[in-house]
A protein has these predicted regions:
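Membrane-proximal basic amphipathic "stem/tether" segments
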Residues: 1-7
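Conserved non-cysteine loop/helix-boundary elements of the Radical SAM core domain that shape
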Residues: 39-55, 81-87, 137-148
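Canonical Radical SAM [4Fe-4S] cluster-binding loop centered on the CxxxCxxC motif
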Residues: 7-57
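Conserved Rossmann-like nucleotide-binding pocket used by diverse enzymes
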Residues: 19, 77-79
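Short acidic donor-binding/metal-coordinating loop in glycosyltransferase active sites
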Residues: 23, 80-81
Length: 148
């Protein structure tokens, strides 16, 4: 238990800003327990409401610009939906990495369902500088491992 408590001891941490950004509601899955589907008014397969949408790239660049102007180090988390199917994923990662790198303590992470597989991630910009959070979806367990 002591190791667990030490892991979350915040006495050494400088002030920072945590940003959890739903960059898209697009996803390869439609999990029955997905908070985002409910939050973005998913109604049915035929009437998706705001589900499976993405803001314009110009609007997203404005968000990234605002993040880059922070006077505090940023911990920026890209989530959704599934960020890796963003149509400009490589550019998104590059611009976000540039924005958080203004401060040495800045961090960028991607929350992913992991469906795309290791080769996808390893081929992307800043792979060695990103953190990945993987959420496994048991409803779609049969789709993992094919690298789609």
């Amino acid at each position: 238990m002591k190791d667990f408590v030490n892991q979350y001891d915040t006495g050494h941490i400088t002030d920072r800003l945590y940003v959890h950004w739903d960059v898209s509601t697009q996803c390869q899955f439609k999990c029955t327990y997905c908070y985002a589907m409910k939050e973005y008014n998913w109604e049915s397969n035929d009437a998706p409401g705001d589900w499976n949408k993405i803001d314009s790239w110009d609007r997203q660049k404005l968000v990234i610009g605002a993040i880059s102007r922070s006077s505090l180090p940023i911990f920026l988390g890209l989530q959704g939906g599934e960020p890796t199917i963003h149509p400009k994923y490589d550019m998104l990662i590059s611009k976000c990495h540039e924005a958080i790198s203004k401060h040495e303590e800045g961090r960028l992470y991607v929350t992913t369902n992991g469906l795309r597989g290791p080769a996808f991630f390893e081929s992307k910009p800043y792979y060695d500088k990103l953190m990945f959070l993987w959420s496994f979806h048991t409803e779609y367990a049969d789709r993992y491992g094919n690298g789609s």
